[in-house]
Amino acid sequence: MSGHNKWSTIKHKKGAADAKRGKIFTKLIKEITVAAKLGGGDPDGNPRLRTAIDKAKGENMPKDNIERAIKKGTGGMDGVVYEETTYEGYGPGGAAVLVEVMTDNRNRTVSDVRSIFTKCNGNMGEAGCVSWMFDKKGLIVFPKSVDFDKLFEAAIEAGAEDVSDEDEQIEVTTDPSNFMEVRDALEKAGFKPDSAEVTMIPQTMVKLEGKQAENMLKLMDRMEDNDDVQNVYSNFDISEEEMDKMM
């Protein structure tokens, strides 16, 4: 399984997605609001906003919530100014971790993130210490039921970099600059994606087992539980057998 999707698969198996829907909504509303403030309220002319709205719809967020978040962004944010930044560090076993945050209090957030690293047998590093281990890419995911050959042909023609047949899904990878263009072309060709986003894909993986694997999952869980954290990326790999032991 490709590394960038490992955590989402594990969360699904743990049944964590539904339990954390409230937090997911909070993070998505913040992303929609900031995207609308920075790039305007028209998703057709604001790729970041359109991606955020699509994610929200994928999580079954009510339309009213989405519209309120856009209005909040375009009409001012009631004095709240969010700062976007990325923290980097190492998890158990030396796995690289990138933490994207959106915060109105940087001192609070950096303290929280550092504490989570420490409590889960990891350590926070300097800017740039692990970001070079990841590539920023557009990732469009399709169900296995899609005709691979037809999707491959359409994706390459639309400008995609790669199409891979993974264990549980088909993944189309693009350069971030033409991500929306490729996605739109594939949708027009009749291919409906399960998800589409610009993400960070690890170049190599770090295999974890035993206590290191347990602590790594705790670290990911606690990072995502923090209201200021928008996204967490890592290059850890945990085998199916190891996951079964922990479930």
UniProtKB/Swiss-Prot annotation:
<dbReference type="InterPro" id="IPR029072">
    <property type="entry name" value="YebC-like"/>
</dbReference>
<dbReference type="Pfam" id="PF01709">
    <property type="entry name" value="Transcrip_reg"/>
</dbReference>
<dbReference type="InterPro" id="IPR026564">
    <property type="entry name" value="Transcrip_reg_TACO1-like_dom3"/>
</dbReference>
<dbReference type="InterPro" id="IPR002876">
    <property type="entry name" value="Transcrip_reg_TACO1-like"/>
</dbReference>
<dbReference type="GO" id="GO:0006355">
    <property type="term" value="P:regulation of DNA-templated transcription"/>
</dbReference>
<keyword id="KW-0238">DNA-binding</keyword>
<dbReference type="InterPro" id="IPR049083">
    <property type="entry name" value="TACO1_YebC_N"/>
</dbReference>
<dbReference type="Pfam" id="PF20772">
    <property type="entry name" value="TACO1_YebC_N"/>
</dbReference>
<dbReference type="GO" id="GO:0003677">
    <property type="term" value="F:DNA binding"/>
</dbReference>
<keyword id="KW-0805">Transcription regulation</keyword>
<comment type="similarity">
    <text>Belongs to the TACO1 family.</text>
</comment>
<dbReference type="GO" id="GO:0005829">
    <property type="term" value="C:cytosol"/>
</dbReference>
<dbReference type="InterPro" id="IPR048300">
    <property type="entry name" value="TACO1_YebC-like_2nd/3rd_dom"/>
</dbReference>
<keyword id="KW-0963">Cytoplasm</keyword>
<protein>
    <recommendedName>
        <fullName>Probable transcriptional regulatory protein Geob_2326</fullName>
    </recommendedName>
</protein>
<keyword id="KW-0804">Transcription</keyword>
<dbReference type="InterPro" id="IPR017856">
    <property type="entry name" value="Integrase-like_N"/>
</dbReference>
